[in-house]
Amino acid sequence: GCNLRCSYCDTAYSLSLTDTAEALTEEELLSRIHAFPWKKITLTGGEPMLHPVRHLCEVLGKEGYEVNIETNGAVALFQERPQGTFYTMDFKCGGSGMKERMLEENFRLLGKEDVLKFVVSSKADMDEMKTIIAAHFHKGEDPAFYVSPVWGRIAPADLVEYVRRERLSDVRVPVQLHKIIWDPQKRGV
């Protein structure tokens, strides 16, 4: 499940997965992971940091896996991260209704191997993103910065124009391709 209730949540079904989730022990999960040839794992959710994932990350890191933890920014990151672990961390701006839940102390734990992602729903959110980057990050070991529009609230072209106009050369604008290929409400893609 997820510990946030963002105004624009596009995966509300993940808030509580009691009817569809399959509970696995760490050993069962490792067995399933080992059945595949890939060495890159993403822990996502809901919110994976609500669960005891540190040991799993340690085991996978020692086995040569890269583990990407997609986290919502409202749960403390590991003070010392396991080998091979990196973060894609959201920062929920004001338009989400969850800004007060964000842990800005997580910023100091992000490095150049990580991603700080903003999902914006208004110009005010875009301005907030710009302010946060300027206040907390100073070139060098900074994470990559991604910004995506809330589907249906901001046109991607307007977001790209904002990034260009404000000269945010470190900010990338990835496209949620699954929302273009399939119906934006389709689950499991």
Report residues per predicted region.
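Conserved Radical SAM active-site core
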Residues: N3-T85
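Short, charged helix-to-loop "capping" segments that act as catalytic/coupling loops
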Residues: G1-C2, V53, E166-S169
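Disulfide-bonded cysteine motifs in exported proteins
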Residues: G1-L4, K186
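Conserved short-loop catalytic and cofactor-binding motifs
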Residues: L17, K117, V147
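Radical SAM/AdoMet-radical enzyme domain recognition
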Residues: V53-A134, K139-P143
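Auxiliary Fe-S-binding modules of radical SAM enzymes
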Residues: A35, K123-V189
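Active-site beta-loop-alpha junctions enriched in small/polar residues
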Residues: G46-P48, N72-A74, K92-G94, V119-S121, ...
